[in-house]
């Protein structure tokens, strides 16, 4: 998302100068970005890079996007009227989590309690399909359309170390101007816009509107 460099930990100018980066700082916070849109954009950029004789490297982000490239898209019906999303938007965070635990305990335990967006999305998918995310993924047929061959590298840290690093990183980001970045975005965008509903921005927006104690901000994020 544009204007969200600190909170989304975008690569620094120095890092971006070292090699060309794609799909960074290109989307308005008011826009919704779907797995389908990502797959389409990836296919275009992948071809551009390989046509130049270079090797594309897919870095970071949500595991769902990698799954989309490997297995194709999940078959989820569209909420054409928007009624399901409207109903869920009216629920509190605790209500979302309680309802999710009842119908999809795996997603409930996998998704961080503060991640309203992913918790709500998992609940929305269940309401639209009658199936949990894990059920949909297990029934998915691999999509050979992309024909990608790649090594997969990842870091596997102890959970305690991971939590410690997250806490340190959150404090560094807050000290680096994350609150000011969010305040600037709120001058032109609603706190309910897709970008500002992501982890951290949502809690900072709540803090700025006095819905959340500033002393508990870092812990809530």
Predicted feature residues:
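Phosphate/pyrophosphate-binding catalytic cores of soluble transferases and nucleic-acid-acting enzymes
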Residues: 1-221
